[in-house]
Amino acid sequence: GDHEGAKYPNWVTCPWPEDFLAILDWQWNEKVIPYWQEAGAFALAHNVPHIAFEMHPGFCVYNPATLLRLREAVGPVIGANFDPSHLIWQGMDPVAAIRELKGAIYHVHAKDTKIDKYNTAANGVLDTKHYSDELNRAWIFRTVGYGNGETYWRDLVSNLRLCGYDKVLSIEHEDSIMTIDEGLQKAVAFLKGVCIFEEKPTTMSWA
């Protein structure tokens, strides 16, 4: 929220009017950082080495810069649950975000987003219409491969490996025009074609 007695979130997205900056300063320095410093210490004391934040619009941590700000204040116990779907519609390049977060990615969601070029051309990407109003929304979540193609996903998984993440890709199904069963089957089949399964080579016979 934006004050001590607030009941609802208040996501500040621009620096003017100046009241917004005062809200941000209060949120971060009086609430967010102290809370997670305490929670991070508690986690470490109980043998939980990582807390993974999903960078999500509407929250204090919504992009690499805000994730790294919290990580700098709290320590490496804080990292990212990297979900590209929330970055795509904000206009970020998830591969660039992966590189920014090198060493700080602790989990990855395999989920896609499709931008509607007609609706965004008219009204931009900030959209409060219900997710079921697919035809009129600026963007919707899609099964992997239905928002971005193979080239995009090959680049994404390759950069995850290059930046030190070679673990689970957790399929998250939030595709409103495809059943869970069909979405899961298609996601598994798609990812099998783009993921790298064998260990990274330790030698290069050509170099």
Show where each model-derived region lies.
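C-terminal helical cap(s) of enzyme catalytic domains, especially alpha/beta-barrels
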Residues: 180-200
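A structural alpha-helix within SAM-dependent methyltransferase catalytic domains
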Residues: 33-40, 44, 68-71, 102, ...
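Gly/Pro-rich active-site loop or hairpin
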Residues: 29, 64-68, 88-164, 181-182
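Active-site acidic/histidine proton-transfer and metal-coordination neighborhood
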Residues: 1-79
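Conserved, mostly hydrophobic/aromatic
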Residues: 32, 51, 67, 83, ...
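A general structural motif
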Residues: 46-50, 75-77, 103-105, 162-168
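Active-site beta-loop-alpha junctions enriched in small/polar residues
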Residues: 1-2, 56-58, 83-87, 111-115, ...
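Short, flexible loop/turn segments with low-complexity composition
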Residues: 172-173, 199-207
